[in-house]
Design a protein with these regions (language model features):
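Conserved short strand/loop->alpha-helix "switch" segment adjacent to the catalytic nucleotide/phosphoryl-transfer site
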Residues: 1-16, 20, 74, 78-81
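Conserved beta-strand-loop-beta-strand hairpin that lines the nucleotide-binding pocket
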Residues: 21, 25-116
Length: 116
């Protein structure tokens, strides 16, 4: 589990940063680390997103895990994959759930398997 703590810290930092940029005055964060899986939940009261922007964010979070890319593309994956912070978050997680409503905020739940 210790090997995953660095990834969790980076993911939480990126999500909190985005919440603050979206004007949130309240950000709730919960991390549940259990055998086999880590669940990261962030909910804010920021500007929220319309359906079009929400779809773009979902696409960014739906990146394949980086270790899966490296297996497929070899060492080139790390150099050729350039994207937003959320794309990087997507590459560190297995599954994302996101909901948002304009002027009401955003809720993101991310799941990362810890068993190899």
């Amino acid at each position: 589990m210790d090997a995953h703590r660095k990834h969790v810290r980076g993911i939480v930092d990126e999500l909190m940063n985005n919440s603050i940029k979206a004007g949130a005055t309240q950000v709730d964060v919960r991390v549940e680390m259990k055998e086999g899986e880590i669940i990261i939940w962030v909910k804010d009261n920021g500007r929220g997103m319309d359906a079009e922007k929400l779809a773009k964010i979902k696409k960014a979070l739906d990146q394949p895990r980086r270790d899966e890319l490296e297996e497929y593309y070899g060492a080139l994956a790390g150099e050729s994959m350039v994207g937003t912070g959320l794309s990087l978050v997507g590459m560190m997680t297995d599954r994302a759930e996101i909901s948002s409503e304009p002027n009401k905020g955003t809720e993101i739940r991310l799941f990362r398997k810890t068993e190899d």
